[in-house]
Regions:
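Catalytic domains of carbohydrate-active enzymes, especially glycoside hydrolases
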Residues: 2, 27-52, 295-297, 442
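Outer-envelope exported proteins of Gram-negative bacteria
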Residues: 47, 219-221, 225, 299, ...
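Conserved, well-ordered alpha-helix/loop/beta-strand core segments that scaffold catalytic motifs
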Residues: 195-228
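Structured C-terminal cap/extension of enzyme domains
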Residues: 459-505
């Protein structure tokens, strides 16, 4: 796909301001949609919205299909009569409103959601009878039947076993013996329904938000990680999809070799796909996954696009990514299957990292726009990430969620020579400000789409960085201050976007 010339803002759902410990799909999200519209923006880019697990990373979700329960808006549940304000308003959701406290959320959020479920049970819909929930409860379960039952079963078994990795469950459940699963379902039927209820509420709230964004002419760019977590419903229920042994243990795991971000590479630990199996089955699982994503997003950013060409395979048990090797991916066979099943694919390819000629050829053949990141540009050479080299069919960023904030980068990561190169290149002045001058350069580029992280419009320091690759803790925590999202800021963003013909005018 090719974008008309436009711009947008990268803002994770978790980073939205508001009460109750984390951003949510209710008023905080709608207020941000209004801010985007007022700022003349076209696209709201978010991070993956799946349930977070290991290290709180949205890229290590326990499901490729489910939504994050933390994002369910409690005020909307109260408006639906499933909660009262006293059920949640006085709970301490964390000591710092500028950071997500995931431990506190884990300890307290599900108790509130269980109260909502208990109230839901009192008016549970019955087919053929008029109730406050006539059809959509059953419709949701029917439309989600390809993933929801296994996800609910996975979550219920996981909770019954102290939330340990599924590899540590009793063997009969671990290897999915039919009798053991049937007995568990019968004994824990209400628990399975609780997890279905949570996903039902997420789906209702998400689709209402998506419809609101469409009314405001804001497209949502979602993000789907290429891999799933080893401890996930997908890996447990669909082990034939992955390179695993008879017990479901990964033979090799995903990561990437040493690069700009991490000198030892990145050991992600995700199970690798059995691409031969996917090819034999016509990529049915991938078609299902992308179809679901396209039902909730307008545009998809596919993480680690280069992994569809060649991917870094690391023997299970390694402590770093250094000893991996490159293996051949599915290349265009996958994207042809997706196109044949789903039609035009509104995909943005995250094509960062070590790039082979074959990856560039795959990107060109696919027609997907790739990414350019300003923070990679100042090498002293004529880098492809310098704005004068951007092609039209790409997405320009000052930085991504894996980079420092622009202010933090300019102040603390550049050498004196690099800082001089950037200053001279953009003609930065004290009057305009370094960060504003850098953003001007991104917006002025030929790239059809420019995406600016909200943290960079706010000129947040390095402490507000979203993620540091290779760092296990203290990531994914930053939250915006609602007081900073002013009409004046929206006007400034609009003015700069209009100057470079990125608004509908």
């Amino acid at each position: 796909m090719e974008f008309k010339r436009c711009s947008g803002i990268l803002m994770p759902i978790s980073s939205l301001p508001g009460g109750y410990g984390i951003g949510s799909l209710g008023k905080p999200a709608r207020d941000f949609v209004d801010f985007l519209a007022g700022a003349g923006q076209t696209i709201w880019q978010i991070l993956p919205v799946g349930p977070t697990g290991f290290a709180d990373s949205p890229y290590q979700s326990c499901s490729a299909f489910a939504g994050n329960p933390y994002f369910i808006d409690l005020d909307l549940l109260a408006a639906d009569g499933l909660l009262t304000q006293k059920d949640y308003a006085n709970i301490n959701w964390g000591s710092d409103a500028a950071k997500v406290d995931y431990s506190t959320l884990y300890e307290k959020r599900f108790a509130v959601l269980r109260k909502a479920y208990a109230n839901f049970l009192k008016r549970r819909p019955v087919p053929g009878f008029e109730t406050p929930y006539p059809d959509d409860w059953y419709r949701f379960q029917f439309l989600s039947s390809n993933w929801l039952p296994d996800y609910c079963l996975y979550m219920a078994i996981k909770e019954a076993n102290g939330m340990v990795d599924w590899q540590r469950w009793p063997r009969a459940l671990r290897i999915r013996e039919p009798e053991a699963l049937a007995a568990f379902r019968a004994e824990h039927a209400e628990e399975l329904e609780f997890w279905a209820f949570v996903q039902y509420e997420f789906d209702r709230q998400w689709r209402a938000l998506h419809a609101y964004a469409k009314q405001k002419d804001i497209a949502i760019m979602g993000d789907i990680p290429i891999y799933v977590s080893a401890d996930s419903a997908d890996a447990w229920a669909g082990r034939e999809l992955f390179e695993t042994d008879a017990e479901g243990r990964p033979r090799r795991v995903a990561g990437c070799p040493p690069d700009y971000f991490a000198e030892d590479g990145q050991l992600w630990g995700n199970p690798l796909y059995d691409w031969e199996y996917h090819s034999r089955t016509g990529y049915a699982w991938w078609i299902s996954r992308v179809r679901h994503a396209l039902s909730i997003y307008d545009i998809l950013r596919i993480d680690h696009f280069r992994g569809f060409d060649t991917y870094w395979a690391i023997p299970a048990g390694e402590t770093t990514a250094r000893n991996g090797r490159w293996e051949q991916g599915p290349r265009m066979e996958l994207f042809r299957a997706l196109h044949n099943a789903l039609g035009s694919l509104p995909i943005v390819a995250e094509d960062l990292g070590e790039m082979f000629d074959s990856v560039r050829e795959l990107l060109a053949e696919s027609g997907f726009p790739g990414m350019k990141v300003l923070q990679f540009a100042f090498t002293g050479e004529d880098s492809v990430d310098l704005p004068h080299n951007y092609p039209r069919n790409c997405v320009a960023y000052p930085g991504t969620h894996d980079n420092n904030t622009l202010a933090g980068w300019f102040a603390g990561e550049l050498t004196a020579a690099q800082r001089k190169q950037a200053t001279d290149y953009f003609a930065l002045t004290g009057r305009e400000g370094n960060v504003r001058g850098l953003l001007r350069g991104v917006l002025a580029s030929a790239a059809a789409l420019a995406i600016i992280p909200l943290a960079d419009w706010l000129e947040e320091p390095a402490a507000s960085r979203m993620n540091t690759p290779g760092k296990a803790r203290d990531n994914w925590q930053w939250r915006a201050d609602a007081k900073k999202l002013t009409p004046a800021l929206a006007g400034e963003i609009r003015e700069l976007s209009e100057r470079y013909f990125r608004t509908a005018r």
